[in-house]
C-alpha cells in the first residue's frame, strides 16, 4: 500500500476532528494508500506537462480506488484515510458513508464489529449494489443490458469520483491534468468519459480518439 508518498499532506488534510488525544495517543489520522501508483503516475504526468509547477489529480481506479491531489510533486490530499475503506465507492468497499449509518445497520441487523467490518470491506460497493460481482467489466455489461441496479451503481461510482475531483481542484486552486490509472482507469472508456463529461466547468476536455486507445 506504500504510505510514504502521502506524508506531505498538511495537517488540515490528514487530521480527523476527533478529540485531539485520539491523534496523539492512538495515531488516528488519514494516511492514504496506493502511494507507489500515485507517485509514479503523477511523475509521468508532470513530465508530460513539461513543468515543475503543476497541479495534477490522479485517479487510481481498480477494485480498490483512490484519488489524490498532487501539487508540484507533493500530495496535498488523498481520498483513502486511516484505512483503505474511506473515499470513493469501490469493488467491495463502501467508501465514504455517514458514520452513524454504520451503528444503525449494526443495531438493526444484530451484527458484531467484525461482521460489520466484513460487510463494509468485502460485501459492499459494486458487489453490494448489484449482488453478483465486484468486477467492473461485469458491471459495465449489466449496465449495457439495461439492469437498473447496474446503471445506478455505475452512476454512483462515477459521481463519487467527480465529487473528489471537484474537491481537489478547489484544494489546489486549479488543475493542469487529470490522470487515470488502474484496471478501470486504463481500460474503461465509458467510465472515463462519464467522469470527464461532468467536469467541463473546470475546462476538462476529453479526447475521444485517445480515450478509446488502451
Language-model segments: which ranges?
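Oxyanion-binding "anion nests"
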Residues: 106-132
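Glycine-rich phosphate-binding loop of actin/hexokinase-like ATP-binding domains
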Residues: 5-106
Amino acid at each position: 500500500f506504500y504510505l510514504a508518498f502521502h506524508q506531505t499532506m498538511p495537517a488540515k488534510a490528514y487530521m480527523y476532528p476527533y478529540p485531539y488525544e485520539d491523534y496523539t495517543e492512538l495515531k488516528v489520522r488519514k494516511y492514504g494508500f496506493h502511494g507507489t501508483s500515485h507517485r509514479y503516475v503523477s511523475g509521468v504526468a508532470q513530465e508530460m506537462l513539461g513543468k515543475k509547477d503543476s497541479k495534477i489529480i490522479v485517479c487510481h481506479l481498480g477494485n480498490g480506488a483512490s484519488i489524490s491531489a498532487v501539487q508540484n510533486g507533493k500530495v496535498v490530499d488523498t481520498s483513502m484515510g486511516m484505512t483503505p475503506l474511506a473515499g470513493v465507492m469501490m469493488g467491495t468497499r463502501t467508501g465514504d458513508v455517514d458514520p452513524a449509518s454504520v451503528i444503525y445497520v449494526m443495531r438493526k441487523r444484530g451484527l458484531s464489529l467484525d461482521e460489520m467490518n466484513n460487510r463494509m470491506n468485502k460485501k459492499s460497493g459494486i458487489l453490494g449494489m448489484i449482488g453478483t460481482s465486484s468486477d467492473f467489466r461485469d458491471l459495465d455489461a449489466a449496465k449495457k443490458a439495461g439492469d437498473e441496479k447496474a446503471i445506478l451503481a455505475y452512476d454512483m461510482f462515477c459521481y463519487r469520483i467527480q465529487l473528489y475531483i471537484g474537491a481537489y481542484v478547489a484544494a489546489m486552486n486549479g488543475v493542469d491534468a487529470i490522470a487515470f490509472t488502474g484496471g478501470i482507469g486504463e481500460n474503461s472508456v465509458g467510465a472515463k468519459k462519464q467522469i470527464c463529461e461532468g467536469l467541463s466547468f473546470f475546462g476538462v476536455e476529453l479526447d475521444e480518439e485517445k480515450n478509446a486507445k488502451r
